[in-house]
Amino acid sequence: SDVMQSKLMAGRSGYDVVMATGDLLPNLIKAGVLKELEPAQLPNRSHLDPAILAKMQSNDPGNRYAVPYLWGTTGIGYDVDKVKAVLGADAPVDSWDLIFKPENLSKLSQCGVAMLDAPGEIVPIALHYLGLPYNSTNPQDYQKAEALLLKLRPYIRYFDSSKFITDLANGNV
């Protein structure tokens, strides 16, 4: 994604079509490196989910430069037996409390805790956990999310967006 963005920003990237993540779109649009879509060339655009298009408006006002290609979710992966051994049988295994309550995460750190190296995923989840809009435009909301995440930082072994998959499967986190 960084390589693609760098090539686009430098000009003459050689790309005809790019698949940029939503968080990159505002910078690419502002820089004028994307061509506006031609609706007549996209007859199946009418079949796109209006709810997803509405969510994309925060990164692409008017949905003029992008269409959704992938849509995913972010969840919590953990070893239930390890969690219950550390936190007890009533551990909040179905709640974000499992990782966003420092008293839980401090205990779980002995098992190893990894977090996605993806602020664009983690910060909105923290905002939601705090009862704030995930796409807030209020700087104070982001300060609250930052304060929460800073409380958790000492208990996180590493940030990575792929290593945790193998480590979780092998019992390392």
Predicted regions and their residues:
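Paired acidic/hydrophobic, glycine-rich loop segments that form the ligand-binding mouth/hinge
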Residues: 16-19, 157-158, 173
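Short, intrinsically disordered, charge-balanced linker/junction segments flanking boundaries
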Residues: 1, 171-173
